[in-house]
Amino acid sequence: GLIEKYLRSGKIKINKKKIKSSIKVKTNDIINFFNFDFKETIVQKKIKFEPSKEIIKSNEDQIIDNNENFIVLNKSSGISVQGGTKSKKNLVDIFAKSEIFQGTKPYSVHRLDKDTSGVFIMAKTRESAQLLTSLFRLRKVHKTYLAICHGELNKDSGEWNDDLIRYDGEKKIIEKAKTLYKVLDKNSEASLIELKPITGRKHQLRKQLYAVGQPIFGDVKYKLSNSFKGINKNLMLHSYQIRFIANNIKHTYTALLPDYFKKLLKTKRLRFLD
């Protein structure tokens, strides 16, 4: 522990002598503290993920396009884009070991929640990463999501303009969030909704659907008390299509719906005409 560490480094001494933690303190012993910080600092280390050949292959099989500048894949639900202190399995570490990125490394150029499936782009070079990142930041990338949510929306189409709250430590931050929506099919139990986020706030679509009382199926974070009945473990939010222009070339990428998404559409008697 921390005391053990300070004993080894000599920040804690007995009678001005370095001692081991096994030594017992006697009466009249003097405990010395040198450059001692009584505040324990917790350092969170990023977890390194070592993917198996099977995991690498299964993710390579999800690739929609592979060109000299970037790859596009249909990301599975339950896998993070980048590693972190909480997440282990992630796309950056997986593709770093792939032959596709031999001689280079994968660059993550945009966000996609761990539990959200669908279109995701990874750059192959620093130059491509800078270009694509700037396109996302300048809102030049047009994104379309599909979601299955509880109940019916009052209007079949429209836009949401919300002030979303997030916290940076104890600091409260309010961010403007704008999304265009269109109901593709609905009944009293569920709705299939097309979502086009104009801004890119964290958990934007999930928060906005929760705010109108129609949370997404499978969302355990933004849910009404009676809305989550364990029908499906997966979050029913899918990044369906991405469109952008890069170097005067138009790019459009569409990701097929996961089987569990199609299964819930059928269960809820919702139709999707792709």
Question: Where do the protein language model's features map onto the residues?
Answer:
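RNA pseudouridine synthases
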Residues: 1-274
